[in-house]
């Protein structure tokens, strides 16, 4: 689960981090009133969506004119913002963040992630702020400095000072950076973050550190113990099919291809997508039906896959372990009849009662292609998607 920038900054403020005065507005009139409440003669207005690249897409504007604030809000509220991080449809804009403008002397980067290799929270800092950290990591990795947080001792001030020295901060800024670092580390732990970024963390013309942006990703598995964070969820930013799938405990991720994939097990699902790609196809989705591949769940999975008009064929790849393949086959048949599938369906069954499952499919009288292996399944579904 991701948070909006205004939500992230609200958390920053709770932990004493320096952020701009700002208001998240639902209407153009609120945006104009927010500028008046903030005061000054220069403001920043930002579309609130779960995606980066807003500035390049026209979703951020610096202005000293309240009429321009009104026009910006009227233009974007209720519309979709398309950036390089969204799909072609973009993300809906339901709120506009109006903030005081900050004079910038320099831009830094500060972020943290859960590193699987060390099984620790790792902080990253760089003098290359304001650009994608992935780009920095690819071209100038030596400019990224790290600090690994030991879960037994927690964040330490000396780690902040070490990063601060590498960023070239002066003594005053070092104290500010240490406070920011410690606050973020505690926040990361308290609220079960999976990702945290301040990009950029700026040095103002007065020489002070300031959190100009905020990006937070939450560990979805921990939401049961984070009711406050869970209440911040904005369902409008979710893919409609992914949200529907979650109601049935189906793990679904929409992609751009034309081969629908229905698989039990995340690892097998990724392997299935790989082999479809290997044979010249493009997966339309990742869909893991999990261990309980019942008729009802399979039917919902078909409905979700076929709600994508780009899908030209469906590959069902099931390994029967605890669940028997003959039962899965009956579920597939029932689902195909219920949903009224109009595209070719290729089914590969392996595991417990796999042969019996294939017999059940063959006797169904439905236009279901039974594959003998995963390679055969991939070849057949790619041909079917191409109309061959």
From Swiss-Prot:
Gene Ontology CC annotations of this record: cytosol; succinate-CoA ligase complex
Cofactor dependency: Mg(2+)
UniProt: ATP binding residues: 46, 53-55, 99, 102, 107
Chain ranges of the ATP-grasp domain: 9-244
InterPro entries: ATP-grasp, ATP-grasp_succ-CoA_synth-type, ATP_grasp_subdomain_1, Succ-CoA_synthase_bsu_CS, SUCC_ACL_C, Succ_CoA_ligase-like_bsu, Succinyl-CoA_synth-like
Entry EC no(s): 6.2.1.5
GO terms under biological process: succinyl-CoA metabolic process; tricarboxylic acid cycle
Record Pfam families: ATP-grasp_2, Ligase_CoA
Sequence positions that bind Mg(2+): 199, 213
Pathway: Carbohydrate metabolism; tricarboxylic acid cycle; succinate from succinyl-CoA (ligase route): step 1/1
GO MF terms held by the record: ATP binding; magnesium ion binding; succinate-CoA ligase (ADP-forming) activity; succinate-CoA ligase (GDP-forming) activity
Catalytic activity: succinate + ATP + CoA = succinyl-CoA + ADP + phosphate; GTP + succinate + CoA = succinyl-CoA + GDP + phosphate
Keywords: ATP-binding, Ligase, Magnesium, Metal-binding, Nucleotide-binding, Tricarboxylic acid cycle
Cofactor annotation remark: Binds 1 Mg(2+) ion per subunit.
Highest taxon, organism lineage: Bacteria
Entry binding sites for substrate: 264, 321-323
Subunit structure: Heterotetramer of two alpha and two beta subunits.
Chain's role: Succinyl-CoA synthetase functions in the citric acid cycle (TCA), coupling the hydrolysis of succinyl-CoA to the synthesis of either ATP or GTP and thus represents the only step of substrate-level phosphorylation in the TCA. The beta subunit provides nucleotide specificity of the enzyme and binds the substrate succinate, while the binding sites for coenzyme A and phosphate are found in the alpha subunit.
Family recorded in the similarity comment: Belongs to the succinate/malate CoA ligase beta subunit family.
Name the record gives this protein: Succinate--CoA ligase [ADP-forming] subunit beta
Species for this entry: Shewanella frigidimarina (strain NCIMB 400)
